[in-house]
A protein has these predicted regions:
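Flavin-dependent oxidoreductase catalytic cores
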Residues: 1-378
Length: 378
């Protein structure tokens, strides 16, 4: 897999190879959003061989957590733990980036002034009433993203990733399904990107030109009325013009609706179904790279080394992210790079990882019983 061993440079940040570990929510943090020993161990085990580690969604506000045990960067007291985490990743040779996020109307119901924040009142959970944000609340949220990014830099992370995918807050503004605003934050794809662009601008002003900023974006949303690839192409170019350094391209891979007390709620997932072929999002990622002219990270069942290598060799993909396979086998990246893919302990796509966090538990894995979540549920 020689082609995966190539170095990649993103705004001065050197990646020793083309494999990244993407931000996978674990629910291993404390209720105060602070790094725990379980978090340090989990990331250290997966930092030995990859070029880049993107730490899971870390909330910019306490009311923006995805789960009770989500990490946080909303206050200064969280920086020391984040610094320990960044150092533990970097000492093993990987670049360390942290994803900053607000879950919006998909948040954990812990209260707060902007619990359920949304562009126009689209509900995702029966226990969180959506809050249609005022212009003043939008302005405050932009400040919160910039402040969280500054704490990430203070903690020693090499870069930040702004979470604009998966129907969390920024994604809710980008999607025509969830953004029905009539002011400057709603309308066509360009107008719906206004909030995202203002977040990027504020983060860039806070961190300076030399600090790497990634942005995670849905290529498509596989739900009626969702964001299309054409929308994503428009948005990606706008993000590039605003100063984003790299795009991490995900998607809403499947969705359904559930009814609770007569109200319908969207259930959406970024995980490819078991019958979806590996690399199914790669061609869309390549199209976005061409539109934006930026380095891109591809995702989507790329734990098969051959598919990852083909994505780089045959399409203009810069970095491949290997997620669920790294949960099942922390050494998967090293085995792929060494040409020993047949030795990987395979993820069987059972979705235990998603099911455990979906029920509010620490992430577990049926294949890897050494995960903190697997041990606790054993």
């Amino acid at each position: 897999m020689a082609i995966l061993q190539d170095e990649v440079i993103v705004n001065g940040m050197r990646l020793r190879n083309r494999i990244a570990m993407p931000p996978l929510t674990t629910n291993y943090g404390s209720e105060e959003g602070i790094v725990t020993e379980d978090i340090i161990k989990y990331y250290s085990e997966r930092s030995k061989d990859v070029g880049l580690v993107i730490v899971e969604a870390s909330a910019v506000r306490a009311d923006g957590r995805i789960l009770r045990g989500s990490l946080g960067l909303w206050e200064d007291g969280q920086v020391a733990g984040m610094a320990s985490l960044a150092a533990s990743i970097k000492k093993l040779g990987a670049a360390a980036v942290v994803q900053i996020s607000h879950a919006g109307a998909r948040c954990f119901p812990a209260g707060g002034d902007m619990q359920g924040a949304s562009p126009s009142g689209f509900a995702f959970r029966p226990d969180v009433a959506p809050l249609t944000m005022s212009p003043a609340q939008i302005d405050q949220m932009i400040v919160d993203f910039a402040d969280a990014a500054a704490r990430a830099a203070e903690a020693g992370f090499d870069g930040v990733e702004i979470h604009g995918a998966h129907f969390y807050l920024i994604s809710q503004f980008l999607s025509p399904l969830t953004n029905q605003r009539q002011d400057r934050y709603g309308g066509d794809a360009r107008a719906r990107a206004t909030f995202a662009l203002e977040v990027v601008r504020s983060v860039r002003e806070k961190l300076g030109k030399g600090y790497p900023i990634f942005f995670r974006l849905n290529a498509v949303e596989k739900v009626a009325g969702g964001q299309t690839l054409e929308d994503a192409l428009v948005v990606s170019k706008l993000l590039a013009d605003e100063g984003v350094d790299a795009l991490h391209i995900s998607l809403i891979a499947n969705s359904s609706w559930k009814e609770v007390d007569g109200q319908r709620f969207l259930v959406a997932s970024s995980a490819f179904p078991k019958d979806q072929p590996a690399g199914a999002n790669v061609s869309a990622t390549a199209a976005i790279k061409e539109a934006a002219g930026l380095p891109v990270i591809a995702v989507g069942k790329l734990g098969e080394g051959d598919v990852a290598a083909e994505s780089v060799r045959d399409l203009p993909i810069d970095i491949v992210a290997i997620g669920r396979q790294m949960i099942a086998d922390p050494d998967a990246a090293g085995k792929i790079l060494a040409g020993k893919g047949d030795e990987i302990v395979r993820c069987d796509e059972c979705m235990t990882c998603f099911a455990t966090i979906g029920s509010g538990k620490p992430m577990g894995c049926k294949v890897n019983r050494n995960l903190p979540g697997s041990r606790r549920s054993a």
